[in-house]
């Protein structure tokens, strides 16, 4: 279900405070665990280090990202490909 328009986008208070403190001109990376926060127009041009459960993934915010969640740009799972059929590998040799 979508979020109510009257509530507005969710942004963690501590993340918003960090953005206001840094300013738009800062090149400093802002570390965050808040994957659930929505990207607002204030974040454009800033770089965030979003935690994926293991490490921090750098995310540079552009105009196209506004309205999406931080976690969408820091994948949590590593895909190694589907397992190959062992029988077909043995026949080829």
UniProtKB/Swiss-Prot annotation:
<dbReference type="InterPro" id="IPR023575">
    <property type="entry name" value="Ribosomal_uS19_SF"/>
</dbReference>
<comment type="function">
    <text>Protein S19 forms a complex with S13 that binds strongly to the 16S ribosomal RNA.</text>
</comment>
<keyword id="KW-0687">Ribonucleoprotein</keyword>
<keyword id="KW-0689">Ribosomal protein</keyword>
<protein>
    <recommendedName>
        <fullName>Small ribosomal subunit protein uS19</fullName>
    </recommendedName>
</protein>
<dbReference type="GO" id="GO:0015935">
    <property type="term" value="C:small ribosomal subunit"/>
</dbReference>
<keyword id="KW-0699">rRNA-binding</keyword>
<dbReference type="GO" id="GO:0003735">
    <property type="term" value="F:structural constituent of ribosome"/>
</dbReference>
<dbReference type="GO" id="GO:0019843">
    <property type="term" value="F:rRNA binding"/>
</dbReference>
<dbReference type="GO" id="GO:0000028">
    <property type="term" value="P:ribosomal small subunit assembly"/>
</dbReference>
<dbReference type="GO" id="GO:0005737">
    <property type="term" value="C:cytoplasm"/>
</dbReference>
<keyword id="KW-0694">RNA-binding</keyword>
<comment type="similarity">
    <text>Belongs to the universal ribosomal protein uS19 family.</text>
</comment>
<dbReference type="InterPro" id="IPR005732">
    <property type="entry name" value="Ribosomal_uS19_bac-type"/>
</dbReference>
<dbReference type="InterPro" id="IPR002222">
    <property type="entry name" value="Ribosomal_uS19"/>
</dbReference>
<dbReference type="GO" id="GO:0006412">
    <property type="term" value="P:translation"/>
</dbReference>
<dbReference type="Pfam" id="PF00203">
    <property type="entry name" value="Ribosomal_S19"/>
</dbReference>
